[in-house]
Design a protein with these regions (language model features):
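Bacterial N-terminal signal peptides that target proteins for export
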Residues: 1-9
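Short helix C-cap/helix-to-loop transition motifs enriched in small/turn-promoting residues
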Residues: 72-79, 108-111, 121-126
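Bacterial N-terminal signal peptides
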Residues: 8-16
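Intrinsically disordered, low-complexity peptide-like regions
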Residues: 4-5, 22, 118, 222
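Acidic, serine/threonine-rich low-complexity disordered tracts
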Residues: 20-97, 101, 166-254
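Solvent-exposed helix/loop surface patches that form functional interfaces
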Residues: 116-194
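Mixed-charge, low-complexity intrinsically disordered segments
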Residues: 87-113, 138-145
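Short hydrophobic/aromatic-rich motifs at helix boundaries and adjacent loops
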Residues: 1, 20, 38, 156-157
């Protein structure tokens, strides 16, 4: 179960480096320029179906997190992300009681955690992600285990540098030692306040103790036109992960 929770956190960090009046034909250039020191709260929810020990299990996870832009220099914004609360349930009382003990340990550990990322005006993470507020041994463990997520986010370009209009599509690709990803994005709608972007892609996580993980993802998200931030409640995605013949299906919203 702890390994599964780590996988969810990896997905969150991964995932983590995503109206009114149509404006057909308008070309826009996306910029990530959030207002400094103005927190944005997201409610991450996931329903995951998997097979554990020959039994089908459905797990629900809820995580409340806060992202705060704290500084900006040369077009790069520093973001501090905190996990404010988290819970998980399977609908099985015995399993939930056992999981609650681990969850309380996670919550206590995460209560002081600040995930620090650097994001440029294209919305891409740059540099190294740091994990502040943790005991040294845990900080080192996070840095080691999540390093692949940082490298992956740094290489994957979510928005093109050229202007795009409603109906335009573009691709994002990254290939490395730990992960490969090929994704296609489409600007579905442009309004005065928001950009609606759909996405679909395939991802391969390599060099994992549990074997190579193949993931497909499809979903959509809205971005605030003024700040470039994801609009809370608009991110929706469905994922399928396969490893060693086992399949995990997830529905995610944020």
């Amino acid at each position: 179960m702890k390994r599964f929770l780590h996988f969810l956190l990896f997905s969150f960090c991964l995932l983590a480096a995503i109206a009114c009046g149509k404006k057909n034909g308008e070309k826009i250039t996306y910029r990530f320029v959030p207002e400094l020191n103005k927190p944005v709260v997201y409610n991450f929810k996931s329903t995951t179906e998997m097979n554990v020990g020959g039994k089908d299990v459905s797990m629900q996870m809820v995580m409340k997190m806060q992202m705060t832009p704290t500084a900006r220099e040369n077009g790069v914004t520093t973001i501090s992300t905190q996990i404010l609360d988290m819970s998980a349930s399977t609908g099985n009382e015995e399993a939930d009681r056992s999981m609650e003990q681990s969850m309380q340990q996670f919550k206590q550990l995460f209560s002081t955690l600040h995930i620090i990322t650097q994001v440029n005006e294209r919305g891409n993470t740059v540099g190294k992600t740091s994990y502040e507020g943790l005991p040294k041994e845990y900080a080192a463990m996070f840095q080691s285990q999540m390093g692949g997520s940082t490298d992956f986010s740094n290489n994957l370009k979510y928005f093109p540098e050229y202007p795009i209009g409603q109906g335009d599509s573009w691709t994002g690709k990254t290939h490395g030692d730990k992960a490969d990803c090929d994704a296609t994005y489409t600007l579905e709608e442009v309004t005065n306040d928001a950009l609606t972007v759909s996405f679909k892609g395939k991802m391969t996580l390599k060099n994992n103790p549990q074997g190579t993980i193949h993931i497909t993802v499809e979903g959509s998200c809205q971005y605030n036109r003024k700040t470039g931030m994801n609009i809370p409640g608009t991110f929706k995605a469905e994922t399928k992960a396969t490893s060693a013949g086992q399949q995990v299906k997830s529905t995610v919203s944020m």
